[in-house]
Amino acid sequence: PNKALITGFWSKVKVDEVGAEALGRLLVVYPWTQRFFEHFGDLSTADAVLGNAKVKAHGKKVLDSFSNGVQHLDDLKGTFAQLSELHCDKLHVDPENFRLLGNVLVVVLARHFGKEFTPELQAEFQKVVAGVASALAHRYH
């Protein structure tokens, strides 16, 4: 991936907003992913999900972690080793969900940045989200 392009763009991302929306959209668009978040309270409608404080907080946490990955693009596997262990061994999250969240993140970035999120930038971010998803799924292999 083009590190300079990615890190330069990422510095403009409002992690709390984008993270909250990305996780919220994942739970709405792919409702079966909600089973990992049943303890978050009301997830019965799109408005409930997107307004849920626990969803917002976890979305920020997810994107803070992704930000850390953006700073360590050469070692995604090492960067996400502990999170991979947690999500795979303890939470038993289907690794496909990591790919889905990555794709939702790209949609949210496009929504927030419009024309600034060029096809070239999208291509770079698809590589990054694929790399992060692969690193998170590492414990399954």
Swiss-Prot record:
| Residues noted as binding heme b in the record, renumbered to the chain | 58, 87
Which terms in the GO cellular component ontology are assigned? blood microparticle; haptoglobin-hemoglobin complex; hemoglobin complex
Tell me which tissues or organs this protein is expressed in: Red blood cells.
Gene3D superfamilies, A to Z: Globins (1.10.490.10)
InterPro entries xrefs: Globin, Globin-like_sf, Globin/Proto, Hemoglobin_b, Hemoglobin_oxygen_transport
Name the Pfam families for this protein: Globin
**What protein name applies here?**
Hemoglobin subunit beta-C
Supply the source organism's classification.
Eukaryota, Metazoa, Chordata, Craniata, Vertebrata
